From Swiss-Prot:
Name listed for the protein in its UniProt record: Alanine dehydrogenase
NCBIfam families, alphabetized: alaDH
Originating organism: Methanococcus maripaludis (strain DSM 14266 / JCM 13030 / NBRC 101832 / S2 / LL)
PROSITE patterns named in the record: ALADH_PNT_2
EC number: 1.4.1.1
Length: 373
């Protein structure tokens, strides 16, 4: 198979979808890999390293898209990339289609086989290709929150861990999954007072076990969320429903109850956000805005700021799936691997992931049916 890896063009997105080790794995399996010039530089990987591993460097993204049967990316294509799609092409990347009607339409119009990292799901309901970036985003959310709590950043001037004789910051984490757990690890490590809310009592019990009395766990409901948000110095939104828009769990009234200079980091922004006052996606160049005196951070590609770590963490997990697709063809690969079948979001002009179809009021065709049509 002909594999194409274009350079990421999202604001300050420095990750790349393949490493030299990945190139070598494809080449040894009999495939050809084409990489856009400079695609790896943001992750400190040179074109020369790719060439040494067996890749061919192409000058432009257009050449990569024109040549490749399967495009492997990190982030969802932006509008300027839609025109590069080749009918029937395989696209393997984070898609986050639920809040992206234009991208969804473009994939359907060009009959793209869209396989989304974030909906590849194992039998135990875990999301293996979302996990590494969720771990990084969760950890970074606390670092970022601590930064924006500083006075020169517009925050209330609170040190997350406090000092002897002065109480630490209140960190409230809504959602106790992979993102929330990793956020809690860093917040606890920095000495903050941490509250985690989740709808799953078994998950709360697990969090109690691993953190002990270092965190407070609460059932996630509107009453408990409102009470926790009011006292939060740092609020982190970590809610995920695989493939679907994130539910708005924190209302505008709740945000209004927060003290001026408090900080919100919504890690769920790439699925539409879980905070009602998060009304826009921000960028690494311009990451925050203020609303009701509260600093809002809504960058959709948080791990892109630590690109080298993120690239290697991501590709460790995506490469085996990408090789399955290349070795067997997408159809056989998804038939043989139920986890990969869950990743299939679009096929032959049809939406094959129910949450995406619901988000855009489009007809839903089960993936198994679409494969046989």
């Amino acid at each position: 198979m002909l594999i194409g890896v274009p350079k990421e063009i999202k604001n300050n997105e420095n990750r790349v979808a393949i490493t030299p080790a990945g190139v070598e794995a494809f080449v040894l399996a009999g495939h050809k890999v084409y990489i856009e010039k400079g695609a790896g530089l943001g992750s400190a990987i040179t074109d020369e390293e790719y060439v040494a591993a067996g890749a061919e460097i192409l000058a432009t993204a257009k050449e990569v898209f024109d040549t490749a049967e399967m495009i492997i990316k990190v982030k969802e294509p932006l509008k300027s990339e839609f025109e590069l799609f080749k009918e029937g092409q395989i696209l393997f990347t984070y898609l986050h289609l639920a809040p992206e009607p234009q991208l969804t339409k473009a994939l359907l119009d060009k009959k793209i086989t869209g396989i989304a990292y974030e909906t590849v799901q194992l039998a135990d309901r875990s999301l293996p290709l979302l996990t590494p970036m969720s771990e990084i985003a969760g950890r970074m959310s606390i670092q970022l929150g601590a930064q924006y709590l500083e006075k020169q950043e517009g925050g209330k001037g609170v040190l997350l861990g406090g000092v002897p004789g002065v109480e630490p910051a209140e960190v409230v984490i809504v959602g106790g999954g992979i993102v929330g757990t990793n956020a809690a690890k860093i917040a606890v490590g920095m000495g903050a007072k941490v509250t985690i809310l989740d709808v799953n009592t078994r998950r709360l019990a697990y969090l109690d076990d691993i953190f002990g009395n270092k965190v407070t766990t609460l059932m996630s409901n509107s009453f408990n969320i409102a009470k926790a948000v009011k006292k939060a110095d740092l609020l982190v939104g970590c809610v995920l429903i695989p493939g679907a828009k994130a539910p708005k769990l924190v209302s505008e009234e709740m945000v209004k109850s927060m003290q001026p200079g408090s900080v919100i980091v919504d890690v769920a922004i790439d699925q539409g956000g879980s905070i009602e006052t998060i009304d826009r996606i921000t960028t690494h160049d311009n990451p925050t805005y203020e609303k009701f005196g509260v600093i809002h951070y809504a960058v959709a590609n948080i791990p892109g700021a630590v690109a080298r770590t993120s690239t290697y963490a991501l590709t460790n997990d995506t490469l085996p799936y990408a090789l399955q697709i290349a070795n067997k063809g997408y159809k056989q690969a998804v038939i043989e691997n139920p986890a990969l079948l869950k990743g299939l979001n679009t096929l032959n002009g049809k939406v094959t992931y129910e949450a995406v179809a619901k988000a855009h009021d489009l007809p839903y065709t089960p993936a198994e049916k679409a494969l046989n049509e």
